[in-house]
């Protein structure tokens, strides 16, 4: 496998924030007297665009617009945004990728402002060539921003590896002509990820071993 650049997804892939997403949405659900969800249920239904996930949760957008409910979730999440930790072995993996002379970037469905704050807080900026966020907090998806980023680069998309934790991440990679790899410690169950047919690994440590073997 030839790989000149890696694009990492942020939430779930590098940041261990599933618990906060479940906690935050349950706070909002209780506000609307809707059933709480378990982490297992969350991993089985979370999807992009997240408006579809909100529909599965039971929200009625005729009475409570998605923009209102989505903002309430973001407010809950943002209040605790510095509590989630980085996934185990992340710093080691980022350093090893740099040592292999492979450049790295980061993309998220979060706003650019939130993403920049978190990258600074976790002292990760030096590892990434580019940090790509969104201009709104409604998490419609990443495909447009990633596509524009690729268009502005001289990279061959087939030599770029996109690493994420959702089916949407896989779709972004394939639709943009990139290689795809998924890690199952994030926002989607392993069973759902395997249905994409792409490589699914359990954690970051297993990824670095796979990457070294695959790029020899």
Task: Label every model-predicted segment.
Residues 45, 85-89, 110, 137, ...:
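Short beta->alpha linker loops
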Residues 3-91:
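N-terminal helical cap/lid subdomain that shapes the substrate entry/recognition surface
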Residues 42, 125-140:
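A short, structured active-site edge motif that brings together acidic residues
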Residues 35, 125-129, 156, 201:
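Conserved H-loop
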Residues 1, 99-102, 152-159, 214-215:
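Glycine-rich phosphate-binding loop signature in dinucleotide/nucleotide-binding domains
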Residues 79-106, 112, 116, 143:
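Short, acidic loop-to-helix structural element flanking the phosphoryl-transfer center
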Residues 161-201:
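Acidic, Mg2+-coordinating phosphoryl-transfer loop and its flanking beta/alpha structural elements
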Residues 5, 142-171:
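Conserved Lys-Pro-Asp/Glu-containing loop-to-beta segment of HAD-superfamily phosphomonoesterases
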